[in-house]
Regions:
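Generic signature of mature, soluble extracytoplasmic domains
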Residues: 128-129, 155-163, 167, 171-177
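Short solvent-exposed coil/turn linkers within tandem alpha-helical repeat scaffolds
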Residues: 27-35, 72-95, 126-144, 172-184
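Start-of-domain marker
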Residues: 3-64
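Single-residue signature of alpha-solenoid repeat helices
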Residues: 20, 68, 116, 166, ...
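Short, intrinsically disordered, charge-balanced linker/junction segments flanking boundaries
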Residues: 1-2, 194-204
Length: 204
């Protein structure tokens, strides 16, 4: 078993992600090590990498990416210089955003609608976090309202029979006056919903 963080880094470099996770979890179970900023960054990298491993059960992927996000945030709290994140230009966050977005679609296609909704919501949360920090990436530009992501979350919420959440997401689109053929169903859905509730004010 790895005894120090350099050993764990070596395991990670060899793509031994399962073993690396066991090792980093054991390493960080010691209170002193749990205050090591490098350990939190490494945990984030390990957990996110393991989430892409073909042998990882799909049911574990969401939690691994969720915990990776929390680990990167903890790293930044402990390292005022933000060295590792600056070296990678904060791309771990972008990777988590894209990974959770894709996971939401994957769960949706598998008819796991609750899991799909959770993944889309987490992707949106990470996107909002990235924008709040003003991180920018050469390969993609993120926007405050990711219309496709919000629509996907709304549709997943409908399928999961979580209508209150679906309405919240649909309203994000209509409140922003999003238009086009792809979004006609949004206005039709809300009109039908509020008509059934006799809520004329919300129809305006």
């Amino acid at each position: 078993m790895a005894q120090d963080i350099d050993d764990i880094k070596d395991m990670m470099a060899k793509s031994q992600f399962k073993e690396s996770k066991v090792a980093i979890d054991k390493y960080m179970s010691t209170p002193k090590n749990a205050e090591n900023s490098d350990a939190w960054y490494l945990k984030g990298r390990i957990y996110n990498s393991l989430s892409y491993d073909n042998t990882t059960p799909e049911s574990d992927v969401y939690n691994l990416r969720n915990e990776a996000f929390a680990a990167f945030q903890k790293y930044q709290q402990l390292d005022p210089k933000d060295l590792w994140m600056k070296l990678e230009n904060f791309e771990s966050y972008l990777n988590l955003y894209g990974g959770l977005y894709d996971l939401g679609a994957k769960f949706y296609n598998a008819k796991s609608y609750d899991a799909s909704l959770n993944a889309f919501k987490k992707a949106n949360e990470i996107k909002d976090f990235i924008l709040s920090k003003k991180y920018e990436f050469n390969q993609v530009k993120l926007y405050p309202l990711d219309t496709a992501l919000v629509l996907n979350a709304a549709v997943a919420a409908v399928q999961a029979k979580k209508m209150d959440e679906a309405i919240i997401f649909y309203r994000k689109l209509t409140d922003a006056n999003v238009g086009g053929k792809d979004y006609e169903e949004v206005y039709e859905f809300l009109a039908d919903h509020y008509s059934k509730k006799n809520d004329e004010a919300s129809l305006m």
